[in-house]
Swiss-Prot record:
Renumbered ranges of motif PRPP-binding: 96-108
Reactions performed catalytically: UMP + diphosphate = 5-phospho-alpha-D-ribose 1-diphosphate + uracil
Matches recorded under InterPro entries: PRibTrfase_dom, PRTase-like, PyrR, PyrR_bifunctional
Cysteines engaged in disulfide bonds, as pairs: none
Protein family per UniProt: Belongs to the purine/pyrimidine phosphoribosyltransferase family. PyrR subfamily.
Function: Regulates transcriptional attenuation of the pyrimidine nucleotide (pyr) operon by binding in a uridine-dependent manner to specific sites on pyr mRNA. This disrupts an antiterminator hairpin in the RNA and favors formation of a downstream transcription terminator, leading to a reduced expression of downstream genes. Also displays a weak uracil phosphoribosyltransferase activity which is not physiologically significant.
EC number: 2.4.2.9
Keywords of the record: Glycosyltransferase, RNA-binding, Transcription, Transcription regulation, Transcription termination, Transferase
Example GO BP: DNA-templated transcription termination
SUBUNIT field: Homodimer and homohexamer; in equilibrium.
Stated name of the protein: Bifunctional protein PyrR 2
Lineage summary: Bacteria, Bacillati, Bacillota, Bacilli, Lactobacillales
Amino acid sequence: MQKEVVDSMAMKRALTRITYEIIEQNKGIKNVVLVGVKTRGVYIAQRIAAQLQQLEGTAIPVGELDITAFRDDQPLDQARLSTDYQLTFSVADKRVILVDDVLFTGRTIRAALDALMGGGRPQSIALAVLVDRGHRELPIRADFIGRNIPTARQERIKVTVNEIDGHDGIEIIN
């Protein structure tokens, strides 16, 4: 059973709130870069970047991070050990905003941090998520949250984005 809990307008408002919070906490966007976790985190990061550019008049870099080789639920193999740095820009001395769609156990973000560190030492790393659903297994928290949606552990959150799914929204799946 699926139940829509956030429609496209509410999702847009959540992303706008995240955008304003990023500007406020960073006192502007100087030295800020966004890095989206594949797949939906990339599209969310691109939307935030577009709003930041509209509000601040400056384009900021947006990177795409594939964390597959860094997941702790995959066997450690040569492919994982030889993974090259993926971003087209350095994160050294930058304020990195890591962007993902859903924060659940924290394991995806841990893998993203591992993947990110090949690009130099950032000034800081903050986490922006569209949905925080709780149930953390690691000591990871989001700095920017679009919506807190408490769920039962066995439920799933499905974020849909227009670029992939043809519409925006957030659903709980039992």
